[in-house]
Every structure is written in C-alpha cells, then in structure tokens.
Amino acid sequence: MANHKLWGGRFEASLEGWVEEFGASIGFDYRLAPYDLEGSLAHVKMLGQTGIIAPEEAAAIQAGLEKLLARYESGELEFDVRNEDIHMNMEALLTEKIGPVAGKLHTARSRNDQVATDMHLYLKDQLGQIADKLLNLRQVLLDLAEEHVETIMPGYTHLQHAQPISFAHHLLAYYQMFSRDSQRFAFNLEHTDLSPLGAAALAGTTFPIDRELTADLLGFKGIYHNSLDAVSDRDFILEFLSNSSILIMHLSRLCEELINWCSYEYGFVSLSDTFSTGSSIMPQKKNPDMAELIRGKSGRVYGHLFSLLTVMKSLPLAYNKDLQEDKEGMFDTVDTIQKSLDIMAGILSSMTVNKEKMLVSTQQDFSNATELADYLAKKGLPFREAHEIVGKLVLECSKAGYYLQDIPLSRYQEVSSLIEEDVYQALESQTAVQKRNSLGGTGFEQIRQELERAKKDLNNK
C-alpha cells in the first residue's frame, strides 16, 4: 500500500488506523493552530527576503496562510487525524489551497523547531493573560484589606487561637504570596521569550536563513543560541508548571481558610450565592463548592508537573517522540490557573465579612496571653518568668471556665505586685493589635504603610 504521509517516502507500508490514532496529537495540539500559522508566516517571509525561495512563491504561500488564518478565526477549519498533528494538517490544508508550491514552506525547517516555536508563542501569550489575572486578584486583596484595617480576628498557629491580628494583615500575607507568584511568572516569560525557529531538526540548516529576522517578526526578544537546546528542552514549560503549582498551592491555602471561615463553627464570612451551591437532600446547605474545587484542582496541576518531569528525566538529546506528552498538561494547567484566578477574585470581591463575629472570637479565648506576658516583661520581669506566671493563670482560668480579662485585680496582684489596673486595657484585642507596630507587624499604622507600598507596586506594573 502506498504511503501518503508527508514523511512517507522511506516507507513501503502505511500505519494501521488504530496505530495512527495512537500516535496522533491533533486531538489536543489543534490549540496551537494560530501560533503555527503565525510561525509559518514569519518563516515564509524570511525565506522570500533571503532569496531561499522565489518572491512569487513566498507571496503565494503567504496569501494561502493568511486565508487559512481567516478560516481558523471564523471556525471553518477542520482537521484530519490522518495528518497526525497541527503542522501536517496545516501543510495539507495549504497544499489543498495553493497547490505544490506549499511544499516549499518547509524549506530550512523541521517539525522539531516548528513545534517548539508554536509552544513558545502559545505560552508567551498565556503568561501575559495569567499576569493580568494575578494583577487583578492582588488588587481585589488590596481593596478588601483597605476596608478591614481595623477588623480584628484571631491569628492562628496549629489551627488554634494564637494572637489577635487585623483581618487586613491576614489578607496582605496572601497579597505578598501572590506578588512573588507574579515575579516567578515574569521570570518564566523571560525564558519563554526566545525563538527556537531556525534550529531545524537539531543541527541547524545549510540554507542562509535569518533567525534574527524571524524572531523579530514573531515578537521574540531573542533567540536560542544552541540548536540542540532549542529543540530538545522543555524547561520553559516545566518552569511554568512549577510556578503554577506554587500559585495554586497559595490559592488552595486561601480556599481552605475561606471554607473554614464560612462554616457555622467560625461564621467569619459568608460567600456569595454566585460561588456556592446547595444539596440535593439537605435544604439548608450552602456549600463553598467553587473554593473546594480550586483546592481540589491543585492535585491535577501538581500531577502535570510530575508527569513532565518524569517524561524529561531520561531523554537523550535531541528530539524524541516522548515530547509529544508535553502539551496536554500545559494546556490543562493554563485553563485551570486562569479559571481559578478568576473564581478566586470573584469569591473575595463578593463575600460578606462578619466583623463582630471575628472580634467576639478573640474575646473568648486566651489569645491575649502573650499580651499579659509582655506586660510583665515591660515592667522588668524576665520574660521566661512572665511566661511561667501567665501559663499558670491560663490553666487556672481553663479549670474555672473564664478568661484572663475576667480575673479580678486582687487575684492578679496576689500573683505579682507588678500588675496594676492598666492590665485590662493591655488585654483588650484592639490594644493588642494596635501595639504590634514593629516593621511588618499587624499594627494598624504598619498595615496602612504596607497598603501604600503595595498600591505603588501595583501602579508600577
């Protein structure tokens, strides 16, 4: 049987259908279509300008590619699994449109540098969109923090009340995490903004190509300077998957807290109906499903990172078919991250904060114990002695069923003559938060300064 593949000259027999289907990637790499056309347009312009092909041939190919791009944008293009991948589908469609001259498009180019170029263009585009969505989420956090500088809530360690803090302080912690995520993706963009086009199969080409020209036409800031490296590594995708894993870990932690906070046990926030669902059997339920889904999707993003690391770990240079497995995880991670960022911004901007419940929660615990120890230390008692005294008072209160602010002054003075009437003000949650004005602390003045720094940072983006 004759082999009609574009690479079929060396073969006497064709692939059987089920084998062909196993090897095909058009079922997912169709997403690279506009980038494949963009890369081909740059390549054919270079071929024409360098005289590698005749000007009229370059013009015919360019016109054909532009028509294919228009058909793609209008949703008219249909792909064939028999053509394996997006590159061979596009070449087949181009040949159908303009005839045999289409075969000159692949001069001085391999599918190896072609697919690498497509993925660099695709990921560069998506990184820009992710950067914008991260910027929006950070703005939402800043707006919410500005509303709640003086909203007092319990701060936790080991999921137990530790010290009272400002709710804004808690939100700004996530702002800082997401800011570092933005920086990581910006570095990722630098490593992605390089053109592999012209590396050919692995060793470059004998044709007098102009790689700087194609890089410039495609909007890349530079080129790969080693042809083997250009076609055989996928570290720019691994970096993206790694950065995405860190980002969705941060999102997952925030989701976990929101899920807890909207429960009856906490009651700190109420999520909008837009981001909640009900139960098919329990009429009273309002479930934080969207937050739970973001938390759950962290697993699939981690999985894509581990999958590609495993694919890459033993690959010899240069191209191997294993690299076909680099795309689906990248595509899915892009979708997951972009949707998760949109959902998280929506959840935060629409939720209701129960300030009173947060404050009351700080008054029904021992999170002011550190304040009492600090109070004694400031009066000259060694902190370790103060810590011991307060620990015993907490034990006493726990057994009796009351809190430190409920202890009468007479009992305090039995414990230490250093304790005076002003101890009760020191034990108030508001006082505890306001006094923590060390750099980076939860004091209101520190938070306002941090908000100003963050606003300047965002405005410079």
From Swiss-Prot:
> What pathway annotation does it carry?
Amino-acid biosynthesis; L-arginine biosynthesis; L-arginine from L-ornithine and carbamoyl phosphate: step 3/3
Tell me where in or outside the cell this protein is found. Cytoplasm
**Keyword entries, A-Z:** Amino-acid biosynthesis, Arginine biosynthesis, Cytoplasm, Lyase
Domain of life per record: Bacteria
Protein family membership: Belongs to the lyase 1 family. Argininosuccinate lyase subfamily.
- Alphabetized Pfam families for the sequence: ASL_C2, Lyase_1
Q: Which GO terms describe its cellular component?
A: cytosol
- Cross-referenced SUPFAM superfamilies: L-aspartase-like
Output the NCBIfam families linked to this UniProt entry: argH (TIGR00838)
Gene Ontology molecular function: argininosuccinate lyase activity
Q: Which reaction does it catalyse?
A: 2-(N(omega)-L-arginino)succinate = fumarate + L-arginine
EC number(s) given by UniProt: 4.3.2.1
Q: State the organism of origin.
A: Streptococcus gordonii (strain Challis / ATCC 35105 / BCRC 15272 / CH1 / DL1 / V288)
**Keyword Cytoplasm in annotation:** yes
Question: Which InterPro entries does the annotation name?
Answer: Arg_succ_lyase_C, Argininosuccinate_lyase, Fumarase/histidase_N, Fumarate_lyase_CS, Fumarate_lyase_fam, Fumarate_lyase_N, L-Aspartase-like
Q: Which protein is depicted? A: Argininosuccinate lyase
Instruction: Please cite one Gene Ontology biological process associated with this protein.
Output: L-arginine biosynthetic process
* Catalytic class of the enzyme: lyase
